[in-house]
Amino acid sequence: MKGNETVIKHLNQVLKNELTAINQYFLHSKMFKDWGYAKLGDYEYKESIDEMKHADQIIARILFLEGLPNVQDMHKVMIGEEPVECLKCDLALEEKALVDLKKAIVDADKLNDFVSRELFRAILDSEEEHVDVIETHLNLVDKVGKENWLQSQI
């Protein structure tokens, strides 16, 4: 089924965000575990896998719409040097993804591509949950202090 070029461009933009997130979260998960923060590492690993599932769905949709998934295009991976900085890097990536997803939802709706719109909406829901978790962690750092928060991540 031939898809609309605007929707396919949005799908590739969202794919770019997801591919970047897979790599960033995977590396952060390994860093967290290496630093001894197993809980944080486990969570970050699960997020990386979640992003991979999103990428899988996006690639399938692009192919269904007779487009070409651009799996070579990624943003610069932002890697923190300590746990709080890692979370701030993840938050910046998620905030960019939210903007792109909201634009994609609006355009898919205008172009009557309701399946792509629903895919974007489902991914948006997942990314908003991740933002909430990151913001909760950062708020805890402010409330209980970095050292106490880190101790809770062992």
Language model regions located:
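Iron-associated oxidoreductase/ferritin-like identity signal
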Residues: 1-154
